[in-house]
């Protein structure tokens, strides 16, 4: 402001501070709430799998947790996008920009998906939605694809029933999976590959492994 005033008053010919830029603000930590491994297991185990809805919900949550997938990519899957290649089951996701991304299925996610598909009876309908809405009157699946907002309502309800924070959301499971992977010795590079992130900086936003370390350090202040 001062130099601009001096330039206008022709006291100086140029503003020497015009090329100076303040420090760039860089976000180093995401805001998505995460769950501990124990609370994630608590949530999954709390789901009543004696119903089709329960089997669907458990499978959907497992796919997000164990493959770090975005909710849009998960609900966008067709039946054919859970497939066997060699001796392993795989997930195929359509990511942003129309790119396809394939991830081997974790054994828990594979088991939950198999149980869901057998009960739903949709294994042969390869070109149809994998995760579907349910008709309230009959309790049977409709041909309609589950929407991300349907998934969010389900997750909020499941979290409440399990006594977990209502703040968790669809993205929670992506962040939870990445953090748990890193805590158990996984590398940031491999987490990036599984999550299909363009940059490791994006993956790092989901990494909350330092949260516990930071708390331990703060607790050193013994007053």
Regions found by a protein language model. Give the residues of each.
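Conserved catalytic core of the tyrosine transesterase superfamily
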Residues: 1-223
